[in-house]
Amino acid sequence: MNQRNMSIINSTPVRVIAIVGCDGSGKSTLTASLVNELAARMPTEHIYLGQSSGRIGEWISQLPVIGAPFGRYLRSKAAHVHEKPSTPPGNITALVIYLLSCWRAYKFRKMLCKSQQGFLLITDRYPQVEVPGFRFDGPQLAKTTGGNGWIKMLRQRELKLYQWMASYLPVLLIRLGIDEQTAFARKPDHQLAALQEKIAVTPQLTFNGAKILELDGRHPADEILQASLRAIHAALS
């Protein structure tokens, strides 16, 4: 086990059903269906645990005057960090990345509070600390090396955020498998290389030993839903 995934695991799983998988695997469809089915039986809510960089980038792009160029700047810098991790990010880029991780941690803390109140949370995505990079819901700055003291401090603080989040195991994690042809057919606006990378990495993640249900995202949606419901009822009983 390398230093990144050395996190203290909380002994009791939280009342969370996490849905993970490559884009195009059917996460959003399954998440919505599970919330609709389970909300009639128990307090159930959905929460998106991605870092929301795309949505935030869209919001920034809509700001008057500086919005569009600044939005393009942030997207290009984020892409640069992913494609050239050996080059340390600049101070502003590192801060933006760190704040995006703080936003994910804020949503995660909100999820924990809801869970303690008796809600069942259905999450689209789940943070992990085994493989760095927002693409895999891991710490983004951990992909980079070097940099000044400010960047090194942000990198360490971000890593601690992900170690903290990864220490909480969901009661069940549903992983949807998919092949690259199907994923690209469903998400033609995504880069094929990015989909291929997610398809290669996601099945290798252990999520700190969480209970994982493996399902084929190419199967009919209702078949996936019913298999998920059976596993959820077993996990909660």
Swiss-Prot record:
Entry annotated with the keyword Nucleotide-binding: yes
Gene Ontology terms, MF aspect: ATP binding
Binding site for ATP: G21, C22, D23, G24, S25, G26, K27, S28
Keywords carried by this UniProt record: ATP-binding, Nucleotide-binding
CDD domains: TMPK
Family of the protein in this entry: To E.coli YghR and YghT.
Protein name per the record: Uncharacterized ATP-binding protein YghS
Organism: Escherichia coli (strain K12)
